[in-house]
């Protein structure tokens, strides 16, 4: 049997991240595609994971997450945003942010509902909506700075709208919402039975002195939102797969109904380790904006004379590369050329759209060692010099 006739996702293939990472391995290319660091975690975190296993924390953890970790999460939210969150009723530890997003969508969205999301949208969003029997309403962000078109959002709202799926800082657009955006969103859904799912895994990767605009800081939205975060991003440890969701007690109960049958719980020793790490280093995340901004600036400065345009990167650990000076639109083909001719794997943006526009942009991951970034930029600059600008 070549195909399964009753597939719930008949048009969904392997994610672009898996495809490009596999191709990078096959070709021995530098992988600036998938968003994970090529440097190690803090050795202390590794020591704490090993210690937790040796101490016997190797059986099921509590379904909602280890209380000591949930208490540290509440403390972190207080330090980050001045918020008071009840670790018992408002914090749920999840198998990464993706599971939190999936479980929240399954908990509150059903057949016939509509979910508004903003393209380019992260590729796990739409399948989660469709698996709930609902429909995604995809509203493109406005390039080149990928701003929200709030008039289109207002026009898309109807009695079937159940959820707005928000993402800030935005992957893959590298944009960041403002407090004004949050106030506008609150105004758009005011008085309606509409919830918000806010993906904020890059909360600490914002640049140029900006503060992260979390929905938790907008009181109307906070009451109607699931807000999702990631220790994988905050601790440079994507393989640990530890995320968490913050919501009101009412919404948290609904989330946990799905979470308990989705994963039940996540790695017990890892939760102990992260709780202990946060106890030892409660503000370890404070240096992240400067750490990643230095990498962003390193890449932008090195590519300044390459001929590539560099759209603003206000958040996330990515940088977009506009190749319109070198080639007609076609980001998948250009990403393939960068991979095979320059030896650098990137991610095209068109897979993140329902209806891709003519795109001349690929995404680079800058969460890499400086030596990796320097070599990648050297290869990209050499590639640009070889192919020359279109019409030159």
Which residues does each predicted region cover?
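A short helix-loop-beta submotif of the ANL/AMP-binding
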Residues: 131-137
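Conserved PLP-anchoring active-site segment centered on the Schiff-base-forming lysine
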Residues: 107-129
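Structural signature of PLP-dependent enzymes
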Residues: 57, 255-259, 278-301, 328-330
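PLP-dependent enzyme catalytic core of the Aspartate aminotransferase-like
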Residues: 337-346, 352-392
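N-terminal small-domain helix-loop-helix segment of the aminotransferase-like
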Residues: 2-96, 103, 278-280, 386-392
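Active-site PLP attachment segment
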Residues: 217-254, 266, 360
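Active-site phosphate-binding strand-loop segment of PLP-dependent enzymes
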Residues: 137, 141-210
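Conserved glycine-rich beta-strand-loop-beta hairpin in the small C-terminal domain of fold type I
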Residues: 275, 290-300, 310-323
């Amino acid at each position: 049997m070549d195909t399964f006739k009753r597939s719930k996702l008949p048009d969904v293939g392997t994610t672009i991240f898996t495809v490009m990472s596999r191709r990078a391995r096959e070709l021995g290319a530098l992988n600036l595609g998938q968003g994970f660091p090529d440097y190690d975690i803090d050795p202390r975190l590794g020591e704490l994971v090993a210690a937790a296993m040796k101490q016997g924390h190797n059986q099921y953890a509590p379904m909602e997450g280890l209380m000591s970790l949930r208490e540290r999460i509440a403390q972190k939210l207080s330090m980050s945003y001045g918020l008071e969150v009840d670790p018992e009723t408002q914090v749920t530890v999840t198998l990464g942010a993706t599971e939190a997003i999936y479980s929240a969508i399954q908990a509150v969205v059903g057949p016939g509902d509509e979910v508004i999301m903003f393209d380019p949208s992260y590729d796990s969003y739409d399948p989660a909506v469709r698996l709930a029997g609902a429909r995604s309403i995809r509203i493109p962000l406005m390039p080149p700075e990928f701003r929200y078109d709030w008039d289109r959002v207002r026009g898309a709202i109807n009695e079937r709208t159940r959820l707005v799926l928000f993402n800030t800082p935005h992957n893959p657009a590298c944009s960041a919402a403002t407090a004004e955006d949050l106030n506008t969103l609150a105004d758009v859904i005011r008085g309606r039975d509409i919830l918000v799912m806010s993906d904020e895994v890059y909360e600490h990767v914002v640049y140029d002195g900006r503060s992260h605009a979390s929905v938790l800081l907008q009181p109307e939205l906070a009451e109607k939102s699931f807000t999702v975060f990631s220790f994988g991003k905050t601790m440079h440890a994507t393989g640990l797969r530890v995320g968490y969701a913050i919501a009101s007690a009412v919404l948290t109960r609904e989330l946990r109904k799905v979470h308990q049958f989705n994963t039940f719980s996540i790695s017990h020793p890892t939760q102990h380790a992260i709780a202990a790490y946060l106890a030892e280093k409660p503000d370890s995340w404070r240096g992240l904006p400067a750490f990643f901004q230095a990498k962003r600036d390193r890449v932008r400065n090195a590519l300044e004379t390459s001929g590539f345009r560099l759209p603003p990167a206000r958040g996330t650990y990515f940088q977009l590369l506009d190749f319109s000076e070198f080639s007609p639109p076609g980001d998948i083909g250009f990403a393939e050329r960068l991979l095979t001719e320059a030896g650098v794997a990137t991610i095209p943006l068109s897979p993140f759209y329902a209806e891709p526009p003519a795109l001349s942009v690929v995404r680079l991951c800058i969460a890499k060692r400086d030596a990796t970034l320097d070599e990648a930029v050297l290869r990209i600059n050499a590639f640009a010099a070889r192919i020359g600008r279109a019409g030159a």
